[in-house]
Amino acid sequence: MQGDRLIFELILNIALLVLIANLISKFRLIQKLILQEDRSLKSQAFLSVVFGGMVVLSTYTGIDIGSYSLNTRVIGAMAAGLLGGPIVGLYASLIGAIYVYLFSAHQAFAMASAFSTMMFGLLGGGFYPYFQRGKWKYQDLFLLTCFAEVCDMVCLLRFTVPVEMALNTILEISLPMILLNASGILIFISSFNHMFIQQDIERSRQ
């Protein structure tokens, strides 16, 4: 029953992020900034704050399970890089990393969580050329997110003392967190697809 409750709460947190994604994707300002190929520093800063806020929200709504917090940080951080590019991914994840490091309820995991949050944003930014303009394949995005979450588990083992604490936590949370977050980012990213479709339609008419 405890495991079912954790999974249900994680699904609710993912649903919250998807709801936010659906809402902000309707704003013309957000559409314009994401569709821009050459963004100004001001535009990148704005997107960094938007996606960084989602990473902070994911930390704040994390589900406590003993010494760790089951969370959805990977969704906002990776989406920042995939949709906004390397700079947006870097600074959005930096905002999230600073927050989790300073305000994490579980200081034993603070360094590992901050490091992995940065990694999520950089990983998304690194794959930005491949995923941009809505041309991504969902199975590739799913596997990329699974890889990111596995790296997160490695960070827990690397930076957490004692190691036994990290290992016990990983055994408890790894499978649901990996699979649900990987599925969640597919729905999150798909919320922005209509922008790219509309842009392609407009270009075909020109």
PLM-predicted stretches and their roles:
Residues 86-91, 134-138:
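Membrane-helix interface segments
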Residues 73-89, 123:
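Generic transmembrane alpha-helix motif of multi-pass integral membrane proteins
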Residues 37-52:
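Loop-to-helix transition at the N-terminal end of transmembrane alpha-helices
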Residues 55, 96-97, 117, 149:
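Residue-level recognition of pore/gate-forming positions within transmembrane alpha-helices
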Residues 84-85, 99-104:
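Interfacial segments of multi-pass membrane proteins
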Residues 23-38:
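Membrane-interface helix-loop junction between the first two transmembrane segments
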Residues 1-26, 48, 62-72, 104-206:
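Membrane-embedded alpha-helical hairpins and interfacial helices in multi-pass inner-membrane proteins
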Residues 53, 70-78, 94:
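Hydrophobic alpha-helical segments embedded in the membrane of multi-pass proteins
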